[in-house]
Amino acid sequence: QKLCERPSGTWSGVCGNNNACKNQCINLEKARHGSCNYVFPAHK
């Protein structure tokens, strides 16, 4: 399981196989991808 601990930070839960993290990053943070570290793509 991967934690969504990225600097953009509206999600503090666990990135599972569901779309919760993806949707929140895309919908609320205007991310291009579902990855929650879209602000710093090289920082994981």
From Swiss-Prot:
Which species does the entry assign this protein to? Brassica napus (Rape)
Instruction: Please state what the protein is called.
Output: Defensin-like protein 1
Reply yes or no: does the keyword Secreted apply. yes
Does the keyword field hold Phosphoprotein? no
Spell out the family assignment given in the record's similarity comment. Belongs to the DEFL family.
Which gene name belongs to this protein?
A: AFP1
Residue numbers of Pyrrolidone carboxylic acid PTMs: 1
* One GO cellular component term noted in the UniProt record for this chain: extracellular region
Q: How does it assemble?
A: Forms oligomers in its native state.
